[in-house]
Structure formats: structure tokens, C-alpha cells
From Swiss-Prot:
SUPFAM superfamilies: Pseudouridine synthase (SSF55120). It comes from Sulfurovum sp. (strain NBC37-1). One of its GO terms (biological process) is tRNA pseudouridine synthesis. Signal peptide: none annotated. This is tRNA pseudouridine synthase B. The lineage of its organism: Bacteria, Pseudomonadati, Campylobacterota, Epsilonproteobacteria, Campylobacterales.
Length: 277
């Protein structure tokens, strides 16, 4: 079965662990997902089965939008509610101050990922090293905060919405907001609203052809060459410039790359979408 869809990940389930439920529900063995959500987070998680699992890197998955709640006065080494180790009372802020602080993060943001994250350090996940109490040398990353808006401030909880580039850690954004306010704080809730074009629609099957972030090209040669995976000539493509392209045939679609005079297959003979239950 080849299927692309969005699940609404429940709270306190790992993204990887939730795939076990998806496998059983759809009676399939090959399942993958894109854009890991933390266990405490909920919301949009892109899932694919069968050959569609090869397509994640080509999907239109950015920008991403989140709703989050920042709990002022709470401290957690994981920057979320899973490891809260202290709670202190802090004085309320004016709504104007909160809004100004949030707006100050719009644009490019360079920061360190959370210690409890899936980032790899010398072949191991950062969260594995953090749990072992080991020192972690994480490199800074740069994200773009396209929009950040205050939804509600009900002390000690700041509810905000952020639209960000792919790979942004909202837990780190929450920690930076807390630093700017000069208080301890941690995220108490996080919900992903959408990833690019993808949002939750009761696990509706999606046509991957309309969700790929690569340009289409037209192959004017014999389709049998594509079907058999034979060597292709750049002369038979409408666009001949270097790049990665989507090629549609009557029965399937392929992803190819043109490099100079060479044509390379990225993925070939990917079954077309069939709108079946």
C-alpha cells in the first residue's frame, strides 16, 4: 500500500512509537514519518507508507506553524513539562512587554538546540547523552521566525503562535523568550498546526504529486525507457538545465536529476495516487 497522509499525534507518545499504531491500523509494514514531534507535543505529523516513504525530502514541508504555551516560573532541563524540577512564583508582566519580547524574535535566529533533542553528536542522539549525564557539544543552528503572535497571556502562562522554518526547535524559542524576560520558564504544551501544505484532515489520503516541492519536466522519448530504468538522454527533456525534476508518465511518476549531459534516476516508477478508502 502506498499512502501519504497526516496524523494527529497524541500527547506523551513518541513519533516513532506512534508508527506502531499506524502499521496496525493500515495493516502495512513499511511506514515512515517526517518532522519528529517531541513526546509532549501533539498535532500534524506527515506519514507515508510503501514507496511513498521515499518522498519525504522532496515534499513541500515549510514553513511550519505551532501553538505553544510557555509556563513562567517553571524550570526543566528538557525545556518541556516532562522533566520539571522546580516551580517559582514570578511577578506578572504587562501584555505590552510580552508582545514586544515576542516580536523581537522575528527574523533569523541563531541558537543552540536543546540538550534533550534528536540531534546526533558523535553518532549518538543528544537526548541519550543528556540522560547519561554526559557533556554535549552541540553546534549552533540558524532558523527563521516568520511570524510570532501572542494569543493570550493568563499569568503565569503565555500562549503564542509561531510560524517558522523547517528544523526550528520551539522549546529553544521558549527558553530564549524566558531569558529575554529574565525568568525561568518551560513549554507546558506544544501543538503543530501544519507543515507547509500539510495539515490534519482525518488521515485523508493525499496525492503526493501535488505536494512535491520540485519542478515538473516533460520527457518526450519512449516511456518504456523510463519504465525499464534505461539510460536517458538529456535531449529528450523539455527542460535541460541542471536540477532535480518530476516526470509524469501515464502509469507512474519518477524523480530524475540532470547534471550536465547526464540524467540520473533519483527514484523511478513511483506508483500514481489512487483515491481509494
Amino acid at each position: 500500500m502506498n499512502r501519504l497522509f497526516v496524523v494527529n499525534k497524541p500527547i506523551f507518545r513518541t513519533s516513532n512509537g506512534y508508527m506502531g499504531y499506524v502499521k496496525r491500523k493500515y495493516n502495512t509494514k513499511k511506514v515512515g514519518f517526517s518532522g519528529t514531534l517531541d513526546p509532549f507535543a501533539t498535532g500534524c505529523l506527515i506519514v507515508a507508507t510503501g514507496q511513498y516513504t521515499k518522498l519525504f525530502q522532496y515534499l513541500n514541508k515549510t514553513p511550519k506553524s505551532y501553538k505553544a504555551t510557555l509556563w513562567l516560573g517553571a524550570n526543566s532541563p528538557s525545556l518541556d513539562i516532562e522533566k520539571v524540577d522546580s516551580i517559582r512564583e514570578v511577578a506578572p508582566f504587562s501584555q505590552k512587554t510580552i508582545e514586544e519580547v515576542l516580536q523581537s524574535f522575528k527574523g533569523e535566529l541563531t541558537y543552540y538546540p536543546p540538550r534533550f533533542s534528536a540531534k546526533k553528536v558523535n553518532g549518538k542522539r543528544a537526548y541519550e547523552l543528556a540522560r547519561e549525564g554526559k557533556e554535549i557539544d552541540l553546534k549552533q543552528i540558524t532558523s527563521t521566525i516568520y511570524e510570532i503572535t501572542l494569543i493570550n497571556y493568563n499569568h503565569p502562562f503565555i500562549h503564542f503562535e509561531a510560524t517558522v522554518s523547517e528544523g526550528t526547535y520551539i522549546r529553544s524559542l521558549g527558553a530564549l523568550i524566558a531569558d529575554r524576560l529574565r525568568v525561568d520558564a518551560t513549554l507546558s504544551s506544544l501543538h503543530r498546526i501544519h507543515e507547509g501544505q500539510f495539515h490534519y484532515e482525518n488521515e485523508k489520503a493525499l496525492d503526493p504529486f501535488t505536494h512535491l516541492a520540485i519542478p515538473s519536466n516533460i520527457y518526450t522519448g519512449d516511456e518504456a525507457y523510463l519504465e525499464l530504468g534505461k539510460k536517458l538522454s538529456v535531449d529528450y527533456f523539455e527542460a535541460k538545465e541542471n536540477g532535480i525534476y518530476l516526470i509524469e508518465t501515464s502509469n507512474f511518476f519518477s524523480i530524475i536529476e540532470i547534471v550536465g549531459e547526464a540524467v540520473k534516476y533519483r527514484f523511478n516508477r513511483i506508483p500514481k495516487f489512487e483515491d481509494t478508502p
